[in-house]
Amino acid sequence: MVALSTLSGLSALPFLFSLVQNVYGVSLEVSTEKGNSSSPILYGFMFEDINHSGDGGIYGQLLRNNGLQGSKPGLTAWAAVGDATIAVDAQNPLTEAIPHSLKLDVKQGASGAVGFTNEGYWGVPVDGSEFLNTFWIKGNFSGDITVRLVGNNTGTEYGSTKISQSSNSSNFTKVLAKIPTKKAPDGAVLYELTVDGASVGGSSLNFGLFELFPQTYKSRSNGLKPQVAQPLADMKGSFLRFPGGNNLEGASEARRWKWNETIGPVENRPGRQGDWSYYNTDGLGLDEYFYWCEDMGLTPVLGVWAGFALESGGNTPITGDALKPYIDDVLNELEYVLGDASTKYGSLRASYGRKEPWKLTMVEIGNEDMLGGGCESYVERFTAFYDAIHAAYPDLTIIASTDQSSCLPSKLPEGAWVDYHNYNTADNLVKQFSQFDNKDRSVPYFIGEYSCQQDNAWPFMQGSVAEAVYMIGIERNSDVVKMAAYAPLLQLVNSTQWTPNLIAFTQNPSTVIETTSYYVQQMFSVNRGDTIHNVTSDSAFGPVYWVASSADDKYYVKLANYGADTQEITVTISGKTGGKLTVLADSDPKAFNSDTQTLVTPSESDVKATNGKFTFTLPAWSVGVLAAH
């Protein structure tokens, strides 16, 4: 279906041209004989904290620079209110992990409200749920603390609470408050904390580690932001690869993602300098990733650090005996995840509230070790990690971070997988349609990252159709391609390090941008069979591509029209009488959805078959899914 909003922006000539497009036809007959089994976990997610996809994104905590973490945090996002000043204070650390606090100095003779604001991650999304606010206070104080969520430009109050509190100058006291809210029309909202200036004039107070959460996805403590989590849940993916990606590797050994610094109370998590320009709080840590998987029914794919930092940073790659402490660290991590409560690290997990071990079946060793000087040493490093992990956990599927044979042992251990990444232009993705047709079936593939990349800020129609063509090729070979994930996954529009991305968002609580590629991924993931069927056709592949599958008594035929002409499609499936047709299309191959426009969305229609024959139109530049019953 061509979106009307797209047509309204076209000149008369292209519009008339679209009315006289050539119409071609393709006839397909789907065999009811079962073919290859299709991977049950084919479609899923790759996540790392890039584009503020974690902090400021799917992680529910809404205040930026909330713990003043890092060696020189500064006052980013903070501002003083009233007759007071604020400063970063290293003399009054909250904990060893949170070495700074926010010092509020109130002027002698102050009056009225004094305190500070936090602007969040380019705004605070107030969605109308009950918010939970925690912070720590130190200093001689007894009185009321007022917390408000207030329009930055309008002064409109979207939530407030008053807390009667006392504290002393010897220790930090934790404060917890619930804030009823009403939904804000945009993200231009500030968090504001004030006290009565007259009662504290000429004195100072210290505040530490602020947290502000809306009602989280599945009501998890320290959980996910529903605004961002729900579109992912709607995709019905099957796996989550975490924590990266480049953000696993770090710029050096010291700056790698350290699992043991992402667990337990958040006041004991120091965070780290992330690999995409900003500091990571690590509030979204190891356990939170597993809760995410549990709440969305996702198979976890845990990436572990493998002795190599980005571009051979620091003293990496690490080889030989020097690698042993890092192998031991991974074994400790796996005991934390999989060990029962009687083990050292399993008991630590239990002490943090999770008695039962997590469900983990897949571990990936490193990330893109074919790049940046990692290839030559990866044979040794992969083998060392593989041998240790496999000896301790023989049932785990272990994935190499590359498929390049020059970086891998001459013979991979039986059961090991390889990870292949493919960022490419639209035309090249289409050319790779048959890439896996003749692959060795003894080595399973994980396509850990792929998308159309050609200097496009947003996924666009031609690129998304090309991705669909590539995905059809993957699904036809889903006996050997076990998993595939579009990347990157998420993007805060205000702070972007990589484009395009699958889902974008702002801090307007109503704004989530579901891109053309998002809809393709959703259409393919939701309509999934467990068996691939042979299809006979009167046409060769191109510009129309197809794959057929089934689950129980339902058949799915996925199609892509990578061209400017309309295609009349006939699909015959013996015994089927009806179904649902979902089509994503736009006659403009450059059409895209963004934070300022939504031009392309799928259309759904009921279709009937005559003697098992379905007939329908596949417009120019389109992706279609027929779910037949």
Swiss-Prot record:
The metabolic or biological pathway listed in the UniProt record of this protein is: Glycan metabolism; L-arabinan degradation
Q: Where is the signal peptide?
A: 1-25
Sugar-bearing residues?
36, 51, 140, 152, 168, 171, 260, 494, 534
Q: Does the keyword Glycoprotein apply?
A: yes
* Disulphide bond pairs: none
Q: Any keyword Hydrolase?
A: yes
GO MF terms held by the record: alpha-L-arabinofuranosidase activity
Q: Which SMART domains match?
A: Alpha-L-AF_C
From the UniProt record, list the reaction(s) this protein catalyses: Hydrolysis of terminal non-reducing alpha-L-arabinofuranoside residues in alpha-L-arabinosides
Instruction: Give the E.C. number(s).
Output: 3.2.1.55
Highest taxon, organism lineage: Eukaryota
Compartments in which it is found: Secreted
Classification via Pfam families: Alpha-L-AF_C, ASD1_dom
GO biological process, any: arabinose metabolic process
Alphabetized UniProt keyword annotations: Carbohydrate metabolism, Glycoprotein, Glycosidase, Hydrolase, Polysaccharide degradation, Secreted, Signal
GO cellular component term, pick one: extracellular region
The record's annotation in InterPro entries points to: Alpha-L-AF_C, ASD1_cat, Glyco_hydro_b, Glycoside_hydrolase_SF, Glycosyl_Hydrolase_51
Q: Which family does it belong to?
A: Belongs to the glycosyl hydrolase 51 family.
> What does this protein's UniProt record list under function?
Alpha-L-arabinofuranosidase involved in the degradation of arabinoxylan, a major component of plant hemicellulose. Acts only on small linear 1,5-alpha-linked L-arabinofuranosyl oligosaccharides.
Protein name, as recorded: Probable alpha-L-arabinofuranosidase A
Provide the taxonomic classification: Eukaryota, Fungi, Dikarya, Ascomycota, Pezizomycotina
